Each structure stands twice: as C-alpha cells, then as structure tokens.
Amino acid sequence: MALVQRQHSYLLRYFRLMASRPRPRLFSHSLYPSLHRHSSALSSSTPRIKFQLANVFSQRLVQRNAVSPKSFMSSTMESLQESSTSKDYSSEHIQVLEGLDPVRKRPGMYIGSTGSRGLHHLVYEILDNAIDEAQAGFASKIDVVLHSDDSVSISDNGRGIPTDLHPATGKSSLETVLTVLHAGGKFGGKSSGYSVSGGLHGVGLSVVNALSEALEVIVRRDGMEFQQKYSRGKPVTTLTCHVLPPESRGTQGTCIRFWPDKEVFTTAIQFDHNTIAGRIRELAFLNPKVTISLKKEDDDPERDVYSEYFYAGGLTEYVSWLNTDKKPLHDVLGFRKEINGSTVDVSLQWCSDAYSDTMLGYANSIRTIDGGTHIEGVKASLTRTLNSLAKKLKVIKEKDISLSGEHVREGLTCIVSVKVPNPEFEGQTKTRLGNPEVRKIVDQSVQEYLTEYLELHPDVLESIISKSLNAYKAALAAKRARELVRSKSVLKSSSLPGKLADCSSTDPAESEIFIVEGDSAGGSAKQGRDRRFQAILPLRGKILNIERKDEAAMYKNEEIQNLILGLGLGVKGEDFNKENLRYHKIIILTDADVDGAHIRTLLLTFFFRYQRALFDAGCIYVGVPPLFKVERGKQAHYCYDDAALKKITASFPGNASYNIQRFKGLGEMMPAQLWETTMNPDTRILKQLVVDDAAETNMVFSSLMGARVDVRKELIKSAATRMNLENLDI
C-alpha cells in the first residue's frame, strides 16, 4: 500500500492492520491429490480485502474490526425491541443445543473471538495436537501448509488418530473426536493416551471441525490409510480405507486440512504467514527434538515460501535469539529439572541496555499470555534469592536497601516452560496457568539453581546486582514525578493537560481520544469532532523515545506526563485496570509522511513499554486519513491508497477533466473534511492494534528504537530490497 511505503514502513514491521474492503478471492487446486475440494459451496465470491500498514517485515500487531458507538447502540436497541415483543416465557423458550451446535452458537467461548485471533486459533488447536504427539515421543516432524485457497493443512508423523469403533458412541474413534465435544485422549489417568499434553477438554479438534465449511482428515496407521470428509461439524462421507503400498506401509501420522467457515468469522478468511511462523518458531524452541516446516502456497508455484524450524539449543537458544540486538551482561543461564512428574525448564539473561523485562511463560508448550503460577514462582524466587545472595556475599553494602521485583528484573529476558500432567488452565483458550503446586516447584527450582550458580560465579552476581542497583536509584529519582502522577486524579479537570480538548461524556466506554500531531492538525480536529464523545490531545513535536531512557527521564518529560494524565494511564508497573482509563478508545492520528510515521512509532513504543495491557484490552487504534481527494465537477472522491486512486481515475472517461489533491498533513484538511473521512464513526477506517506475538514485538522495538545503530542499520538494509522506491516520501 502506497500509504505505508511513504511512511518509513520499516518502523512498523509488526503492525498488521486489516479492514473490510472489496477485492476478489483467489482459489487454486491443492498440491495434495488426496485432499480435493468437491463442493462448489465451499467457494465464495464475497468481496474482502486486507489492508497492511507495513509490508516490509513480518507483522506482530494485529487489527480487529472496530464497531462505532452508533452502530452498537442501534443493534442493541433492535435486540431489546425484538426481545420485548414476547412476554411469555415457558418451556418452549428453553433451547437444548446438541452435538457441536453450542460451538457454532457461541464460537467466542471456544476460540476467543470470531476475528483474526480466533481464526488463527483454529490453526493452533490442530498444531498443538501434533506437538502433543511430539512431546509424548511419537512424532519428530510436523508440516504446515497455508494453501492459496485460504485453507490450512497440518500433518505429523505421530501414531495417527485411532480409527477403530468406539464402544461409547458406536462410531469410529476418529469420527468421535471430530464430532463429540469433550472426547479425546488427554484427560489423564491410566486410560489417557498422553502423560503430558496441552489438551485438556477434548474439544480442540471438534471445535475446528464445527467452525469449518469443510474439513478433510487422513490417518495412516497399521499399514492402512483412512480418509473422511466433514462440513460444519458433520460427516459428509463415510470413513474409507485402503492398504498402503509396500513402500509406504511403515509411514504413520495424521493430516488435517480445513476451510474456515465464512458464516462464522467476521474478518476476511486469510491466514497471516508471519503470525503462524512466529507460533511455529516458538514451538520449535520449546521442543528441540522436533522439526516443523511451514509452506505458504501461491497461485504461482515459483512464489511459494518454505521455511523449516529446528533449534537443538531449546530455551537457551530462544533467549539468545530474543537478545540478539542487546548487550548481554553474561552468558544465558538455564536449567531443566523434573520434580514429582512435572518438568521445569528455565532460561534467563540480563542485558545492560534494556530497561524493562521480557518474561514468557509456557505450560505444556501452550503460551500463557496472562502468566500464571509458573511466572509467579519465577518472580518470587528471583527477588528473594538475589537479595539474599547479594547481602550474603556483601555485594550490597547498605543494610537498609532491599531490591524489589521491578529492580531485579530490569533488563531481564526469562523464559519458563513447565510440563505438568494435569494442568489447570483458565478457559478453553488457556491464557493463564492456575496449578498452585507449580508455583512452589518453580520457586524452589530457580532458587536452588541460582544459588549454586551465582555462588560459583560472583562476577555474574555482581553485574546483575549492579544493574538492579541502577534501577533502584533511577526509581528513587523518579519517585517525585511518579507521586505527582499518582496524586493527580484523572477525574479532576484541573490536573488535565492544558491543550487537551475533553469531551462532555464522562463514560470511558463511549469516549475516545485522538492523539494528533501539532496545533494545526489539533485545530482542525477540535473543530471537526463530535464534542459529545470525542476528545483531542495535540502533541508538541516528537515525544521522548522511552526505549533509550530510564524511568526517571520518562516521568520528567512534559509530553509523556500529558499522555499519562490525559489518558489516565496510572503509574508504570502497577496492575492495569481498564476502568481507570478516561477513554477506552485511544486513537493515534498522524500525518501521512515520514514525521507522522515516526511520531506514531514513538507513541506505540511508549504504550508498549509503559502499559502493554492497553493492547490486550483493545484500547489502541490507528486512524486512517485519506491520501487523495479527486474532484470531478461537483463530485469529490477520497482515496486511502494508490490502488483506490487508480480505480477512481480509471472509471472516468478518457477525456474527463479532474483534479487530484494529495494530503500530506491533517492540517491541510478542512474540519468538515476531517470529520467525514477520518473521525465520523459511520464512515471512517479505524484500525485496532493488539499484540499477537509479545516476544517478537519486544525484539523489534528493541532493534528499531534501541541505542544500537548497527542493529537498526542492518534491519533497514535487510528490508530495502522489499521496498518500492517510487513510493518513498523523500
């Protein structure tokens, strides 16, 4: 997209932004002759498009469709009116959902959402099943293919799903796990097929089946190949089998191919290669004995992309990879320990040029994005053990100094992976581990390892404590500014920034704030907004790059203070509470030039480092102003990219006379134009950002916004070959 390439697209590698716009769907035949699509109902001409804010690097911040307040209120009132028409309430109104109907009725309960994240969750469910086979020692190779018809196939060389008759259902075991909720081999106990697995509820495969237009499965085991096809959770063919040829009789495993259902998902059915590659890379680090391949097919076979992931070093190599662009204080520390049937695997490293921590937790190879008892165990052990060792070995001389968890974790990259026979996850999407015994096991293991290692390597302890003491001193220097932020109530207008043009609504859920670049754009935005629910905060130039500054410098910066106070962000490090925000929509609105792209990136860096939970809560948005205005007679057309401009001009007669205006700054637009094209909830394009892969996003911010010029230069050089020089705004 031309808009992107004019805005230093290398600064926004991991921002994938999508919005519905027309474009034709592309389909092609499968490379697997045994997996054909027979039903014409599986194809669709539904117009969809994917907008990308950057196409230079793999993306890690993903967009979700935004619903305008007016649209929300309209649909809500319609629902209320419909429900109020029936005053009777009897047994006729009680619905009994059977089979996989609950999944199709409430898909969000099983996959988190019906947007992009839920779409990719389907892939992860099948991929995690293959990983469970690998963790059990039965699979060593997993292949993932993103087909050009928007389907996905995942195959492994594990044992293969059983196909014999199941005594409880009277169906084959294969059909049972595909069509019956809570049917699987991972419930633990003597009858379980796995000692350790990421599956708990026996719903993963059946959920994918329920939410797919079509699903095809091939199982190879016992010298036979079994095949069956499904549509929206129901079998459309019987289970067929044939004897494998002699040269293939030793092969075994499972291959699942599915086409997500367009009736279920609210976004375009389009899998992001980089998102899935990030998850596969993660799994390869966590399972060092497994090779995972990823292939992205194209209509033109010469443009197919193939990658293979294998990391013999495991978590130690993972930490090194994450810290590639940083200055480590010591070699990567790590250990693996088994206690009472559970396995604890931890790797960690401190870096001198990092001012925040990166802590990633996994349970049975499932990424627990909301942490859990394993992360709590590491944090508690680190704080207690480092304080104890520092005082014991007299690295800390003052008796009164006690380093907090924030101090000892500054600059830390830590990965903890646990394998637990009976994991207790919160919800089907498994975002948090709840086993209380895991905290004790992890805490004890980390303490024993660090105590032994650091007593033998006092120089490493000294470097870590020195880094922690610097964090402690910086925290003291920032205390006055922090207390100022804490003492100023976000509800008092007297404490708000002077340039903030607030909205009249006091309900954060319906309020939104536009962070705009400069007084010129701020003036147009203030005049063009809807004062009832839209606030405007103009910035004075570029804000501080907090990636290169400590906490003290950050709190002293006036523009940063304005953001913290104006938005109600609270104090860094404190638990995030969305209800404390003054606005639940924070919209970044900058000019379509290099400076605008830079300011947007600085703001994203600030939000990611200061309060990362803003992305998880769905509060961060990017506004999209038009690039062009095309006037022909009394008609005016606004175009948001070069493709739209070409489409409009191509629709005019050859001898037509028209004028094209290129907008580079928001200040060039009249208030009415800005409202209609960029701020009106009914007509604007608003793109929501969420963190899809925290580890890679963290690494990119470190590379692009950190102090190391050589790393940034190398990153830019590696992207140069993929940029269209004609679209650069020089």
From Swiss-Prot:
Molecular functions per Gene Ontology: ATP binding; DNA binding; DNA topoisomerase type II (double strand cut, ATP-hydrolyzing) activity; metal ion binding
Names of the cofactor(s): Mg(2+); Mn(2+); Ca(2+)
CC per GO annotation: chloroplast; chromosome
Plastid recorded as keyword: yes
Catalytic activity: ATP-dependent breakage, passage and rejoining of double-stranded DNA
Enzyme class: isomerase
Binding site for Mg(2+) 2: 591, 593
Keyword entries, A-Z: ATP-binding, Chloroplast, DNA-binding, Isomerase, Magnesium, Metal-binding, Nucleotide-binding, Plastid, Topoisomerase, Transit peptide
Main localization, broad class: plastid
Enzyme Commission code: 5.6.2.2
Single GO biological process annotation from the record: DNA topological change
Span of domain Toprim: 511-618
Co-factor binding comment: Binds two Mg(2+) per subunit. The magnesium ions form salt bridges with both the protein and the DNA. Can also accept other divalent metal cations, such as Mn(2+) or Ca(2+).
Coiled coil start-end: none
Transit peptide: 1-34
Subcellular location, record wording: Plastid, Chloroplast
Annotated binding of Mg(2+) 1, by residue: 517, 591
Site positions (Interaction with DNA): 542, 545
Entry's family note: Belongs to the type II topoisomerase GyrB family.
Subunit (UniProt): Made up of two chains. The A chain is responsible for DNA breakage and rejoining; the B chain catalyzes ATP hydrolysis.
Function description: A type II topoisomerase that negatively supercoils closed circular double-stranded DNA in an ATP-dependent manner.
Identification of the protein by name: DNA gyrase subunit B, chloroplastic
Organism: Arabidopsis thaliana
Gene: GYRBC
